[in-house]
């Protein structure tokens, strides 16, 4: 089913570029970015969204149809967060809330479709506990976790579970080191400069789900 993966990747790439363009048009007056840099952002956005669709297509090919739809929904939101964070160094609270609520509703729909109401209630209780815990950490340690970071981490938890989230954090940290250290050494970014975190969470999640 190479055609399915190829089609998914192409559709995702185009969707990512279009989404990047929409976000850029919304923020163009607030940020000054060279045409060369914005073209690079278009490419990165297309790759992020293309990989999201490709990963879901890979899971669909393995026969996990319903899980693939849930995975695709979560990865689309994560890729959208990454694209906006790259362009604006922030993710809209509205987009974060839509992502979290949408994924919760989608997961509950899957449980109801399978008639697993007990699992659904357990899932809601555990998810609520994790969300509150992340929000408390963000309040107590604002330098450790930003206001929107806990929403993104919660979305990662919904996609990957608790153990998977640990692995995603490790993979994200590794990706951050591999990308940021060369940029620091070449002085393309300065020490202490704010960097977007959502792209690294997206990379870590894609790596975990693909494996």
List the model feature ranges, each with a label.
Residues 1-211:
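A membrane-topology feature that recognizes alpha-helical transmembrane segments
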